[in-house]
C-alpha cells in the first residue's frame, strides 16, 4: 500500500544523478516503495527527454514521449522515476484495454456469507488517489472510448468523475501523467505501426510537453550493449559489438530512405549479442534468428548483404549464395 500523504521532500542533484547541467529544482521521495521501478545502473539518459520528464515530475506537466520502437521511451520515464523514488505504473493501451479496465466495474463479493455488489476500482482512479506516476504506453493505439476518459484527466485540475458512484476524484498532489507513442497523434504515415490512430487535436493540445526520443549515437549504443553483455568486454568482443551496432545503423539508414520496412532497435542488438553467446558464438546464426527472420522476405537479401559487408560471412539469404 502507498501512503497517500507521502510527499517528495528530497532535493535531487541533477548534475550528479542525471549528468545534466541544469539548475531546475526537482524533489523525490525519501523512501523506496514496492511500486518504484528498479534502477538500471547501465541506463544512458537522453538530455532533452530527461529534462522534459523531470519537468513533468517537478511541475506536474503532462509529458508525451514520441519515437520509433526500441528507443527506450517507457524505460526512460521509469528510470527517471526510479532515481526519484517515485512510484510508477505502466498501462499498455492496446486495443483490448477498455473504459471499464481504466475506470472500474461492479463486482459481486461475499460479505458475511451473502453476495453483495460492490464497485471495483480500475487503475486510473487508484493512480489518481495515490502519489504515483501513470505511464500510458502505445498511447496512439488506444480505443476512442478510452481516450476520452484520459482527456478529462489531462486538464489542469485533472478531476475524474465516476458517474456510477456519484463521485469526483481530485488527483493526489503527487499524481503524474505520462504517455509514449510511436506517432505524434497525426496517424501512421510510414505503414510501420498498424493499429495506431490519429489523436483528437483537442486532446493533443492538453499535453504540456512533447519530447522526441531518437536512436542513440553509435558509441553510446555500443556502450549500452556492452554493459548489458559484459562477457564481450575483450578486444575481439568489443569489435563484434561495434559491428553489430554498425549493422543496426545501416538498417536505420535504409529504413529512413524507404529501402527497408523493418528496423533494428537497440533492444534487438542486445538480444543478438545475448543469443550469439547461447549459440556458441555463432554470430551469423544468432543474427538470422534474432532479426533476419523478422524481415520481409523480399528485403532479407539486402539485410544479409549488410551482414556480409561487416562480418565477411555469407548467409544463406544473401545474393551470392542464392546465385551459386
Q: Which positions does each model-derived feature cover?
A:
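AAA+ P-loop NTPase catalytic core and its hallmark functional loops
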Residues: 1-238
Amino acid at each position: 500500500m502507498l501512503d497517500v500523504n507521502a510527499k517528495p521532500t528530497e532535493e535531487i542533484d541533477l548534475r550528479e544523478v542525471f549528468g545534466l547541467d541544469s539548475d531546475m529544482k526537482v524533489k523525490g521521495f525519501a523512501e523506496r516503495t514496492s511500486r518504484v521501478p528498479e534502477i538500471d545502473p547501465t541506463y544512458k539518459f537522453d538530455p532533452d527527454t530527461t529534462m522534459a520528464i523531470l519537468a513533468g515530475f517537478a511541475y506536474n506537466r503532462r509529458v508525451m514521449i514520441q519515437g520509433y520502437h526500441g528507443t527506450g521511451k517507457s524505460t526512460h520515464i521509469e528510470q527517471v522515476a526510479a532515481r526519484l523514488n517515485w512510484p510508477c505504473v505502466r498501462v499498455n493501451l492496446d486495443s483490448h484495454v477498455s473504459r471499464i479496465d481504466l475506470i472500474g466495474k461492479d463486482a459481486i463479493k461475499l460479505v458475511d456469507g451473502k453476495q453483495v455488489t460492490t464497485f471495483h476500482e480500475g487503475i486510473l482512479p487508484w493512480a489518481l488517489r495515490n502519489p504515483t506516476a501513470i505511464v500510458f504506453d502505445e498511447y496512439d493505439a488506444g480505443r476512442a472510448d478510452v481516450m476520452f476518459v484520459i482527456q478529462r484527466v489531462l486538464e489542469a485540475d485533472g478531476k475524474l468523475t465516476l458517474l456510477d458512484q456519484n463521485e469526483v476524484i481530485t488527483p493526489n498532489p503527487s499524481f503524474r501523467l505520462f504517455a509514449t507513442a510511436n506517432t505524434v497523434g497525426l496517424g501512421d504515415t510510414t505503414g510501420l505501426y498498424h493499429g495506431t490512430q490519429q489523436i483528437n487535436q483537442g486532446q493533443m493540445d492538453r499535453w504540456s510537453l512533447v519530447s522526441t526520443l531518437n536512436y542513440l549515437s553509435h558509441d553510446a549504443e555500443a556502450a549500452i550493449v556492452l554493459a548489458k553483455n559484459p562477457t564481450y568486454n575483450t578486444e575481439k568482443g568489443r569489435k563484434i559489438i561495434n559491428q553489430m551496432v554498425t549493422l543496426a545503423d545501416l538498417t536505420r539508414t535504409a529504413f529512413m530512405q524507404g529501402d527497408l520496412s523493418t528496423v533494428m532497435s537497440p533492444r534487438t542488438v542486445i538480444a543478438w549479442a545475448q543469443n550469439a553467446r547461447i549459440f556458441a558464438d555463432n554470430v551469423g546464426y544468432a543474427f538470422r534468428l534474432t532479426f533476419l527472420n523478422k524481415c520481409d522476405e523480399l528485403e532479407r537479401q539486402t539485410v544479409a548483404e549488410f551482414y556480409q559487408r561487416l562480418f565477411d560471412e555469407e548467409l544463406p539469404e544473401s545474393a551470392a549464395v542464392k546465385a551459386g
